Amino acid sequence: MHLKTALIATLLTIGLGASTAQASPQVVVSTKPLHSLVSGVMAGVAQPKLLIRGHASPHAYALRPSGARVLQAAEVVFWIGEEVESFLSKPLRSLARKATVVALGDTEGIHWLGLRKALVWGSHEHEEEEAHSGHGHEGGDPHLWLDPQNAKLMVQTIVATLQAVDPEQAQAYQDNG
């Protein structure tokens, strides 16, 4: 009888200990390039989940049931935004309602790249800078991470977001960023 009581006490102690330990947030990232940035910031803490796997393009991707489940469990979702991943707009509103959703294309200071012609960046000039802030970047190159300054700005946003969601690991995120 004492063995049974000791076993129950041990299981309760283990169970209570597990429930008080803070788990890392469930982080979902839309594309491989962004996943690389987020993985770097989360190194040593947790591994973010990649939504679009393989050689699939975010421009023509159809969300699978497994992807829907991943979004439902997400606490944080990083994506470029509707300009690149339009398929994600509705699922993020309906499936990831509880998640902190971060469109990295909206990061302050991001420079949207011009269309590439013959492997050379085209210009992305506007007559008025105010006109730049509100437009949807149609026709621009959405591969924002190719500009090192953009990548730095996105990493800063990733660090700040993860620190807000997971303050216990704030220093690790800062060190990795």
Language-model-derived ranges and their functions:
Residues 1-5:
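Positively charged n-region of N-terminal signal peptides that target proteins for export
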